[in-house]
Amino acid sequence: MGLKKRWRWVSGLLCVWLIGCGGGISEQVRSQVTYSGSFKTLQQEPEKHTGATVIFGGKIIAVDAKEDRTELLVLQLFLDGSDRPEDNDHSDGRFIVRSRQFLDPALYPKGTLITLVGQLEGSEERLIGQRPYRYPVIAPVEIKKWAPRADTGPRFHIGIGVGTTF
């Protein structure tokens, strides 16, 4: 195998490897996670875990940019093997991401999927409609925004005759 062919082959493998590494949270930050329990357990006893470094994901359902901080209200979603939130109807609750830095609502719009590593600051009670709800409050260390996935739903085509499909 010539040097040029070998170089192309190695370059191709390197590109595939780099694309595959374009995942979620950085390994350095992920290694700081100290809480390995479920979101449901943390939500039931947030004071017991205050100060723990957690990793959770979800979908932004509201953004509130205040003078001294930005709050993201997030619907918790389970993470897949790449730390990407699974965008489905399975959730154990909601949490607040409270950042001392300005997070532009145009860059963190409603519906955005995020994964974050952050420190649990405790909890805060707010209303959902008329119902009181206790939100875990997390100060972010790193937030990963996920681009929307292309429609990956099942596709099939059954043709009968000319121009007829189901």
What do these predicted regions represent?
Residues M1-C21:
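Sec-dependent bacterial lipoprotein signal peptides
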